[in-house]
Amino acid sequence: MQYVGGGQGDGTYCNPIIAADFSDPDPIRVSNDYYMVTSTFETSPGVTVLHSKDLVNWKIIGGVFEELDRIDPAFSAKYMKRYNGVVYASAIRYHNGLFYVYVSLYTDGMFYAIAKDPAGKWTVHTLKDKHSNPLRMEGWTDPCPFWDKDGKAYLVSSNPGKNWFGYLFEMTPDGSQLLDTDVEHMKQRGIAYEYLLGGTLYSSSSSTEGNKIYYRNGYYYIIHIEFLDGGNVAGTYVYRSKNLYGIKENGMLGKPGDMRTYEMKRFDLRNTGTYRQEIPG
């Protein structure tokens, strides 16, 4: 294991906590332990996995993809043709005694991996569409899974391009299949995807990425960033509702294919050195 933390050994720490290229960090807490995954671009092992007891001192404990060139030879050191188009913004979650990592390889499709021990071997699978076809296509990125209290599973993701929108998908309870997608429809670029072929549109802003979904104290939170000012103003957007698909003003609940409205708040951290936000609820 490789130590990469920011602790100074005297009860203090320095920022950045990890002074290296560990971009798109996604941490979770399981009991008294923290685990985090970060982007690796074309480098193997793909998707770095780290462990901490205090969110300050981190150790690299493994990687999800042992060799990315098993996905495509273009990842290999011989060709090196995947640098700016591969392992971005994965998400790690713990569900029913197992660790899950979801990641879209920008040039190669949607994948998920499962492990009993996050420091051990990960079993990698290709995510499938509603027809059980592998979701091998370009463009989709920044996925995040979510298991609701009723056992139903969901995924948020977005597709960079002309219509850089965010989508909410229904998954099978085991997280292996998107129930409202068709890979041939998902292969198209620069369009607004249709429900039952490409999920439910949740954000029609200009540059939706960094998608995350959480449930806390009776509220669902869908979080993403906008880094372009062409649609909404750039910043971090937090959507909140007591119904996952939102609620209309007359009280009607949203549902798959018919998204309603959320409480929404935008945070712009570009011009502030520090920021603290207390989450309601």
Where are these regions (language model features)?
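Carbohydrate-active catalytic/glycan-binding domains of CAZyme proteins
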Residues: 1-281
